[in-house]
Amino acid sequence: HLPFPDGAADILLDCFSPLAIDEFRRVLKPGGYFLYVVPGARHLWELKQILYDAPYPNEEKETPYEGFAYTDIVPVDFPLHLERQADIQSLFRMTPYCWKTPKSGVERLETLETLDCQASFRVHIFQKL
């Protein structure tokens, strides 16, 4: 339960979290927006290639939600250049890969001194009807 009254919000942002679509419907004003940020197909692809023997791209899909118009998908892509093992580990620890990577992948990652990879996001924009 979001701590806002019904119809109080003009805009909501959900970044890499499960959607609380019923709560979004409740707290958004008519005509209000919610932005749903998800990883793009090749988000952190170079990192995944180090961690996994057979990495796969993230699924990209358009999912309609009742009571909302799907207005746009905005791609946000940019390179990351990490120059220290500590920074590589910080990136790794903030991903779900940290919890499911095989030991061999973690060991490969620990040998790197630098890492160049691509961040890739998709911002799905919805407007409440």
Where are these regions (language model features)?
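A short acidic, Gly/Pro-enriched loop at the edge of an enzyme's catalytic core
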Residues: 1-12
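Short, well-ordered secondary-structure micro-motifs
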Residues: 5-7, 25, 47-48
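Residues lining the SAM
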Residues: 10, 15, 37
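S-adenosyl-L-methionine-dependent methyltransferase catalytic core, i.e., the SAM/SAH-binding region
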Residues: 11, 22, 52-57, 68-75, ...
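A short glycine-rich, Lys/Arg-flanked "PGG" loop and its adjoining helix->strand segment in the class I
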Residues: 19-35
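Conserved Class I S-adenosyl-L-methionine
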Residues: 76-129
